[in-house]
Design a protein with these regions (language model features):
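A short acidic, often aromatic-flanked loop/helix-cap motif at beta-alpha or helix-coil junctions
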Residues: 42, 73-76, 126-130
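A secondary-structure boundary/capping signal
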Residues: 5-6, 39, 108
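Acidic, PIN/NYN-like endoribonuclease modules and their adjacent C-terminal/linker elements
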Residues: 1, 94, 98-130
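A generic structural signal for short hydrophobic patches within well-formed alpha-helices
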Residues: 9, 40-43, 74, 112
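Short, well-structured N-terminal submotif of metal-dependent ribonuclease cores
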Residues: 1-35, 45-58, 127-130
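Active-site neighborhoods of divalent-metal-dependent phosphate/nucleic-acid chemistry enzymes
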Residues: 19, 65-110
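Short, structured coil segments at secondary-structure junctions
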Residues: 29, 60-62, 115-116
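General small-molecule cofactor/ligand-binding pocket signal
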Residues: 34, 67, 121
């Protein structure tokens, strides 16, 4: 089960997902399309969309299961912010992945290197893939 980070959604929308990961990405979108509410906000707030591509992006992300912030995610986010100095948005996304036991798919794996108990998949690294 996977949680997609904002950058992965943008790369997918732009057709920039690595060729070796496209089949996996299609499977994830079919079987396990989950995003944090923060990812949804960041993705739809991205300034790179024109009005037509924004409408397509909105329709695309509506197919995802959006995970809202609950008390467990709140508590984990606070701990990550206090102990790890991680940015708020990344802390919420990381806390969501850990709370729901999901593998976070992101290109920015270094942002999450100090997050305990997180599973991260970077499809842009040579040794990534399922």
């Amino acid at each position: 089960m996977y949680l997609l980070d904002t950058n992965i959604l943008i790369y997918y929308s732009n057709g920039s997902i690595p060729p070796g990961f496209r089949e996996d990405m299609d499977r994830i979108l079919t079987e396990s399309f989950r995003v944090s509410i923060i990812t949804k906000l960041e993705y739809l707030g991205w300034s790179g969309f024109d009005s037509d591509s924004f409408d397509k992006a909105k329709e695309f992300v509506e197919n995802a299961e959006t995970i809202n912030i609950d008390q467990d995610i709140t508590d984990r986010t606070i701990s990550l912010r206090r102990e790890g100095g991680i940015r708020l948005a990344d802390a919420v996304i990381a806390a969501t992945a850990v709370s729901r036991q999901l593998t976070l798919v992101t290109r920015n794996d270094n942002d999450f290197i100090n997050v305990p108990d997180i599973s991260v998949l970077n499809p842009f690294k040579e040794d990534s893939g399922n």
